[in-house]
Amino acid sequence: GWIVNKAASIGVKGSKHKECTVCKKVLETAEIPALSRISISKASVTLSTSTYAYDGKAKKPGVTVKLNGKTLKNGTDYTVSYSNNTKVGTAKVTITGKGNYTGSVSKTYSIKNNFKKATVSGISTKAFTGKNITQSITVKYNGKTLKNGTDYTVSYSNNKKIGTATVKIAGKGSYTGTITKTFK
């Protein structure tokens, strides 16, 4: 069989030979082709979180990178960089191949206005009618009046019987988070 003189590595050819088993004379030599780096561009990238609430701090989700069923190692097989990851909008994480890997792949995630910082007005005690009771809600974020259906959704529970009802106002679109209020 072949005896390896020098193993091939990425970008570097190797060599091997066959020798006589009795006298050890080299009978044949051959080149081992250089190994090529594998492109990371088709890797699947999973983020630990895809939506963040804005708080002025850089958002860096955890990253899992898989290629051909193998989970790659951060620092060994790839490096991670983030861009546009502090302000409200679309942020990006870029995975760049390292070591045995080449190329890059990117994934985006969202940073949305923190709906919990919105102010809600128009919730008051209502008289029992035997019907579902709703409220004339106004939601403001940094002084701007938000639109029901576009910026938030409203849902009610326990709002037909006498007692405490709950209204849940959930951020939508460029807002994330939920505000819960009660009324009687």
Model-derived features: positions:
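Serine/threonine-rich, repeat-prone extracellular segments and beta-strand-based repeat modules
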Residues: 1-17, 70-102, 107, 144-181
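Hydrophobic beta-strand residues in large extracellular and virion-surface proteins
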Residues: 45-47, 63-65, 80, 93-95, ...
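N-terminal cationic amphipathic segment used for targeting or macromolecule association
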Residues: 5-6, 28, 32, 41-43, ...
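Thrombospondin type-1
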Residues: 1-40
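General secretory precursor processing signal
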Residues: 5, 23-26, 57, 104, ...
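Compositionally biased regions
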Residues: 10, 37-45, 49-51, 82-84, ...
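Solvent-exposed, low-complexity, repeat-rich "mucin-like" stalks and linkers
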Residues: 38-70, 114-144
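Interdomain boundary/hinge segments at the C-termini of tandem beta-sandwich modules
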Residues: 31-37, 109-113, 183-184
